């Protein structure tokens, strides 16, 4: 299986595939799902998908959970869809692997 992220070591950034479920009971990352042979990290978000609320909560949640600056996290694809691509800048590959491995069982 392919990874649900693509790390660029020269730029210290990662493209991360997310499958987001808005209107959830809690904000939670839980394992992964495969859609059209592409793996995605599953993310449940409490916010509604209206006027960018869910997208804003995704950035806030990831920044807080992973101890990253909000300015280093950007949704680059899927602004109005539940399948999203996230760009995270200024992240060390070892730290990224530590984060990812904490969700994969």
From Swiss-Prot:
InterPro entries: DUF167, YggU-like_sf
Pfam family name, one: DUF167
One GO CC annotation: cytoplasm
Gene3D superfamilies on file: YggU-like (3.30.1200.10)
NCBIfam families named in the record: DUF167 family protein, PRK01530.1
PANTHER family according to UniProt: UPF0235 PROTEIN C15ORF40
Family named by the database record: Belongs to the UPF0235 family.
Listed name of the protein: UPF0235 protein A1C_06510
Origin species: Rickettsia akari (strain Hartford)
């Amino acid at each position: 299986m392919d990874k649900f992220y693509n790390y660029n070591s020269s730029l210290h950034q990662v493209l991360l595939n997310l499958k987001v479920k808005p209107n959830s009971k809690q904000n939670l990352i839980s394992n992964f799902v495969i859609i059209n042979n592409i793996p995605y990290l599953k993310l449940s978000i409490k916010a509604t998908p209206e006027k960018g609320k869910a997208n804003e909560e995704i950035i806030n949640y990831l920044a807080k959970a992973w101890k990253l600056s909000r300015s280093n996290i950007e949704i680059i694809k899927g602004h109005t869809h539940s399948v999203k691509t996230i760009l995270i800048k200024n992240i060390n590959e070892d730290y990224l692997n530590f984060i990812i491995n904490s969700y994969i069982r």
